[in-house]
Amino acid sequence: MLRLPGSVEGLFWAAGLALLLSGAAGAASHDAVGAPAALHATQDDLLDRALDKLQALSVAVLERPHCGGPRQLATYNMGLNQLCLSSELRRQPRLRELVLSHELVHVVQDCLDGLDNSTSLSLAQGLRNTGAFTDQQVAGFFLQYLRSQGNLQHVLATTSVLPQDSRQRELEAYALQYDPALVQRLLATHCKVKS
């Protein structure tokens, strides 16, 4: 990754964020799900709105005792447009928020390539498609989030066994999971209900 002085790196980060939020990173041409969440909404309200938006997008939300493999609290299946949340999350609201935000990033990635197919597009690819950033700048955008959270090395180690495209999608989800308001905005901007 290209190491830039902090202020310059911050400018690239802010510019990338602005492009993601503006929809310039490649939103499908459908009608909007709804307006951005109110500024003073509680996190529970934001999560409930996100779940409502998923329903409007025809993304099935299932609550089950187990989702995926052992110790997995949630999964998003892009081929089926199906989100599974472990019922264990009901007892742990903060963890529920974190896990749901992580999975919502995967929904946004799926929206970037169209919910009607079984593929997704990484947010990084969406930024690259704008032509405004180099690969190094795009990588720095998400690594900045992970660095600021102090979990960069853990996430890199956890995702190292994945194929590169899957790894990129997971890095993005881990990077943005601690910013539920941003994830909500990405969902509203890039995931549209067909007219």
Segments the model singles out, each with a brief description of its role:
Residues 69-70, 95-97, 111-112, 122:
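Acidic/His-rich structured neighborhood in mature extracellular/periplasmic domains
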Residues 89-91, 114, 180:
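Solvent-exposed loop/turn segments at secondary-structure junctions
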Residues 104-121:
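Catalytic Zn2+-binding segment of zinc metalloproteases
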Residues 60, 68-72, 123-195:
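Metalloprotease/metallohydrolase-associated module, dominated by Zn2+-dependent proteases
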